[in-house]
Amino acid sequence: MKNFKTSEFQSVERRYLSYIFFLFGLSIMSLAPRTPDLKANLNVNNGTFGTLLSTASIGSIVMLLIGGQIVHRIGAKRAMQIGSTAVAITYIVLAHTKSPFVFVVASILSGAAISIYHIASSGHTLHRQDQVGKIIIPKLHGAWGIGALASSAIAFLVAANVSIAWHITTLMVVVWVIT
């Protein structure tokens, strides 16, 4: 992360962290409003689709067990870069695939990517919160919520005229470039 004074929380740092949380919410919630399109791409029944969706938890649980050590070793900034790149790639694959097997692999990897990003961003924020002696994480989670809401609004506006593949690919590339 950028070097800021450890004893104070500057507005530029608040802005950077808000962008990080906003973009995280925007990206990881982008598939939720398009789940009917994901199911249609896979041509599976509801039970199978629910099972396929739940496989992301495998990657998430594994990363929750080892993510702290990874972030400690490579740093929060690098972990967020890796996480955001992996989220972008796996979400693009999820939006394009018609194969349940490919979907499972991408889903597991996306769960891991989301977890490492979350561990790195929240861990860094909690560390800064301790350093400056101010509660800052609730506002940043508010930025995450605004990003998630923006993702739903984008999906509402484009779903009728834009395929899930174009929608998610475009959004992931834009978010990744900004991140």
Name every feature range the model reports, one short phrase each.
Residues E8-P36, A40, I108-L109:
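Pair of pore-lining "gating" transmembrane helices in MFS-fold secondary transporters
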Residues F21, G50-S57:
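Short hydrophobic/aromatic, small-residue-rich stretches within specific transmembrane helices
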Residues M29, A56-L65, A148-L149:
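Residue-level signature of mid-helix packing/kink "hotspots" within the transmembrane helices
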Residues T35, G67, G147-A159, S163, ...:
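Small-residue (Gly/Pro/Ala) motifs that create kinks and tight helix-helix packing interfaces
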Residues N43-G50, P138:
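Small-residue hotspots at the loop-to-helix junctions and early N-terminal turns
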Residues V62-F101:
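Conserved MFS/SLC helix-loop-helix module at the cytosolic interface between two early adjacent transmembrane helices
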Residues A106-G142:
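Cytoplasmic helix-loop-helix junction between adjacent transmembrane helices
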Residues W166-T179:
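Symmetry-related core transmembrane helices of the 12-TM Major Facilitator Superfamily/SLC fold
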